[in-house]
């Protein structure tokens, strides 16, 4: 079996039917013409935010990471492992793709520990066992994995989806693409940066060009590139016609170098 490709979905993608239609059409085309197995990892911040707003619960973020108090983890689990995950499975079904919905704890695929008490139920992801997902891939399934994990003590944890995708890529020896709302990392003039090293990233963070959630994304990608020993792509889901080329390893966004 070829080494898998993990496609991490993020941003408002889950909120846009048009975007999901484009993405799944590209996935169908890719699966028809290539033998390479695919895995989807997703967060669903927009789904969570909508739910929290509807329940009048405050959304608190610290250094770009969502703080998850004990009284909110059940709600966030429901939004990510429930609504967001099953929405993606429904789209797969609509496109005749045999998909299986998972969370990080299934088959111990990704090990999760609590990041820090001050973040509450926020988990740190580490590589786990490839057995379950490899078995699904060998049988032609598309695993769709939410970024909810569980600790050895049985505590549910909300994991940053970029970091969850990195840990799963390390588990499977997979390549990784982080798909988001932006077409890559932009410089101070709004132009896409084709390649990024750790030194360049540090410089842009110091200059205030890379900020907030993008810092988390860039650090996750740098961490992924270092962990995996291969480049990681940050790209946009908005340009469906470019997705098959991107899945084939053509750089379309910002390529993060190890």
Swiss-Prot record:
It catalyses: N-acetyl-L-glutamate + ATP = N-acetyl-L-glutamyl 5-phosphate + ADP. Pathway: Amino-acid biosynthesis; L-arginine biosynthesis; N(2)-acetyl-L-ornithine from L-glutamate: step 2/4. Its main location: cytoplasm. GO terms for biological process: arginine biosynthetic process via ornithine; L-arginine biosynthetic process. It comes from the Bacteria. HAMAP family: ArgB. GO terms for cellular component: cytoplasm. Keywords: Amino-acid biosynthesis, Arginine biosynthesis, ATP-binding, Cytoplasm, Kinase, Nucleotide-binding, Transferase. The record marks 8, 217 as: Transition state stabilizer. Catalyzes the ATP-dependent phosphorylation of N-acetyl-L-glutamate. GO terms for molecular function: acetylglutamate kinase activity; ATP binding. The keyword Coiled coil does not apply. Its EC number is 2.7.2.8. The keyword Amino-acid biosynthesis applies. It is an enzyme of class 2 (transferase). Substrate binds at residues 44-45, 66, 158. NCBIfam families: argB (TIGR00761). This is Acetylglutamate kinase. Homodimer. It comes from Shigella flexneri serotype 5b (strain 8401). Belongs to the acetylglutamate kinase family. ArgB subfamily.
């Amino acid at each position: 079996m070829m080494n898998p490709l993990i496609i991490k979905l993020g941003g408002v993608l889950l909120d846009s039917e048009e975007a999901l239609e484009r993405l799944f059409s590209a996935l169908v085309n890719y699966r028809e013409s290539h033998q390479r197995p695919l895995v989807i990892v997703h967060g669903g911040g927009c789904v969570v935010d909508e739910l929290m707003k509807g329940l009048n619960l405050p959304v608190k973020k610290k250094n770009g990471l969502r703080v998850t108090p004990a009284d909110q983890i059940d709600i966030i689990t429901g939004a990510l492992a429930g609504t967001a995950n099953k929405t993606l499975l429904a789209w797969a079904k609509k496109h005749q793709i045999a998909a299986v919905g998972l969370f990080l704890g299934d088959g111990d695929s990704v090990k999760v520990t609590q990041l820090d008490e001050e973040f509450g139920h926020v988990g740190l992801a580490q590589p786990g066992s490839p057995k379950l997902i490899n078995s699904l891939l060998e049988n032609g399934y598309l695993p769709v994995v939410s970024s909810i994990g569980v600790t050895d003590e049985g505590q549910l944890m909300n994991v940053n989806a970029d970091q969850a995708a990195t840990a799963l890529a390390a588990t499977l020896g997979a390549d990784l693409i982080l798909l988001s709302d932006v077409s890559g990392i932009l410089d101070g003039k709004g132009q896409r940066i084709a390649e990024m090293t750790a030194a360049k990233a540090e410089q842009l963070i110091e200059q205030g060009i890379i900020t907030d959630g993008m810092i988390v994304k860039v650090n996750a990608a740098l961490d992924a590139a270092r962990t995996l020993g291969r480049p990681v792509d940050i790209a946009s889901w908005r340009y469906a016609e470019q997705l098959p080329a991107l899945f084939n390893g053509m750089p379309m966004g910002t390529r993060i170098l190890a």
